[in-house]
Amino acid sequence: GVGVAPMLPIVQALKAAGNRVITVLAGRNKDLIILEKEMRESSDEVIIMTDDGSYGRKGLVTEGVEEVIKREKVDKCFAIGPAIMMKFVCLLTKKYEIPTDVSLNTIMVDGTGMCGACRITVGGKTKFVCVDGPEFDGHQVDFDEMLKRMGAFKKIEREEMHKLQPECEATKEMDEKSRNAAWRQDLRKSMKPKERTAIPR
């Protein structure tokens, strides 16, 4: 799913350093499984899990991870994706005492730590994802606090997206008509390319 893109260079670097790499790709459905070919090229084994069973095996990422833990000696785990998924992977790996790195995707506004939107608690201390992370020891992250903070604007986001959608479609339709309006075509024909690019914008 969403964590595959940032995970790919990590997998490639681990493999290049001579590690045995087992990758568990997971998503809600087949359409959300991306970069499979690239992951296979840099992994010794790839397990694919989908929530609906439309591709690979039906189940959650934690099921695939636990299967690997039970049959292999796992020295390190990396988890990148939705916060809830990272939380449960970390709970699982903590049980087996496997160090786990996560890459957090909290709300970030200014990228300097000034706004505090990305504030989290790691090992009982306040950290800012934008300046202290985004990678952290997953066993130290207070995921419950993080999930609560990330959900603070969900209702407002849903309301705004609902308002925005019809407007976007209308704007797109209007833009298409406006872009190819007869008066614009006449103007384009009457001007040489250099004259068109010289118009102050």
Which residue ranges define each predicted feature?
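FNR/FR-type flavoprotein reductase catalytic core
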Residues: 1-110
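Local cysteine-cluster metal-coordination motifs and their immediate loop/turn environment
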Residues: 4-6, 83-84, 105-135, 163-172
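Iron-sulfur (Fe-S) cluster-binding modules
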Residues: 15-21, 28, 35-45, 65-68, ...
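Short C-terminal domain-edge/linker segments immediately following a structured domain
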Residues: 53-57, 77-80, 108-111, 131-134, ...
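Glycine-rich, flexible loop/turn motifs
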Residues: 57, 100, 126, 132, ...
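Short acidic, glycine/serine/threonine-rich loops at helix termini
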Residues: 90, 113, 141-142
